[in-house]
Swiss-Prot record:
One of its GO terms (molecular function) is acetylornithine deacetylase activity. Zn(2+) 2 binds at residues 108, 141, 351. Belongs to the peptidase M20A family. ArgE subfamily. It comes from the Bacteria. One of its GO terms (cellular component) is cytoplasm. The active site is at 78, 140. Its EC number is 3.5.1.16. It catalyses: N(2)-acetyl-L-ornithine + H2O = L-ornithine + acetate. It holds the Pfam family M20_dimer. This is Acetylornithine deacetylase. GO terms for biological process: L-arginine biosynthetic process. It is found in: Cytoplasm. Keywords: Amino-acid biosynthesis, Arginine biosynthesis, Cobalt, Cytoplasm, Hydrolase, Metal-binding, Zinc.
């Protein structure tokens, strides 16, 4: 049976829905897309290992060749949900219009596996000395469960890893982390005609906000990384809700905020800073202020700017490595081996209606991946 074409693989990936979401109404498994990847890669000679990470959630690990070290090409197999009313094309079909591939996951980032497939076909593997690995993870768009699972249970240690997120084929060597929390203030409701009979949660939240803004100033003052366009951590107050009526003392108020820590700031250290910032107001209002994570925190990531892997990939891409502010699975895979983020398409298309990947990325991406395979597997 002839091998499927690049286009057939791409179409198969996009037409197989694999949405992950914290909303159970949207959340799907990724088993169908993993099964397709397993079939395609095994046809190229890869050995396949599928790990059940959670119900309906799988990681795929594929290996071509033998020996130690080698190169790992990694990516996530899930996508975000979509707003059908804002799409002009079928999100679950590969539509070719305007020299672009349209569809959910074309850029972020199921399409990357089609490029791996095509690059492997283009390489003569007869003199291979080190293995090539492919990792397809689950739930990157929500909990990064797949990457966390792989890091904790990695069955091999490659020399290097490339994560194929959309970077416009510019190597990314560092990014900030992401921590999102809720602060819930519980007061005591009552009629507004007698404030003494209640405890106003909005007024307590006012004190909480002041403490967080002081923490924000402290983070800016004490932490700096010249490699980033925004060289300090950021703290954003993103959502607040409290009360239900102007003539009622507010009984509860909730704030959602996020922090984007620089590489090198430990998650435990940041957590301690946040609790220190709130300690005084919590002591003033015992039992009324609760800090709750909105998702598992993601640390910052950095591959040292002078690492040989950066020099090698920059030479292949003819692009200097850069830093970005968005998050990837790199902080986890970096624990296994030196890791860079590099892939086709623009991050501007990620999580957008009418997501697309421009045709202009096709040949350069296959060329870059083929050269990386030849450099690190031979």
């Amino acid at each position: 049976m002839p091998l499927p074409s690049f286009l057939e693989v791409y179409e198969g990936l996009i037409s197989t829905s694999s949405i992950s979401s914290t909303d159970a109404r949207w959340d799907e498994g990724n088993e169908q897309v993993i099964a397709k990847l397993a079939d395609w890669l095994s046809a190229l000679g890869f050995s396949i290992q599928i790990e059940q990470v959670a119900p309906n959630k799988q990681n795929l690990i594929a290996k071509l060749g033998s020996g130690e070290g080698g190169l790992l090409l990694a990516g996530h197999s899930d996508t975000v949900p979509f707003d059908e009313g804002r799409w002009n094309y079928n999100p679950h079909a590969l539509t070719q219009v305007n020299n672009r591939f349209y569809g959910l996951g074309t850029a972020d980032m199921k399409g990357f596996f089609a490029f791996i497939y095509e690059a492997v076909k283009n390489v003569d593997w007869s003199k291979q000395t080190k293995p090539l690995y492919v990792l397809a993870t689950c739930d990157e768009e929500t909990t990064m469960l797949g990457a966390r699972h792989f890091t904790e249970n990695a069955p091999f240690k490659p020399d290097y890893c490339i994560i194929g997120e959309p970077t416009s084929l510019v190597p990314i060597r560092a990014h900030k982390g992401h921590v999102a929390n809720a602060i819930r203030v519980t007061g005591k409701s009552g009629h507004s005609s007698n404030p003494a009979l209640g405890v106003n949660a909005i007024e307590i939240m006012h004190e909480v906000l002041f403490a967080l803004m002081q923490l924000r100033d402290r983070l800016i003052k004490e932490y700096h990384h010249p490699g980033f366009e925004i060289p300090t951590p950021t703290l954003n107050l993103g959502h607040i809700h409290g009360g239900d009526s102007p003539n009622r003392i507010c009984g509860c108020c909730e704030l959602h905020y996020d922090v984007r820590p620089l590489p090198g700031i430990s998650l435990d250290g940041l957590d301690n800073l946040m609790h220190d910032a709130l300690r005084e107001v919590q002591q003033k209002w015992p039992g009324r202020i609760e800090l709750v994570p909105l998702h598992d925190p993601i640390p910052g990531y950095e591959c040292a700017h002078d690492h040989p892997f950066i020099h090698g990939i920059s030479e292949i891409c003819e692009q200097e490595a850069q830093t970005v502010n968005y998050c990837t699975e790199a902080p986890f895979l970096q624990q296994v081996c030196p890791t860079l983020v590099l892939g086709p398409g623009s991050i501007d298309q990620a999580h957008q209606p009418d997501e697309f990947l421009a045709f202009e990325f096709i040949d350069p991406t296959v060329r870059v991946l083929s050269r990386a395979m030849q450099k690190y597997c031979f």
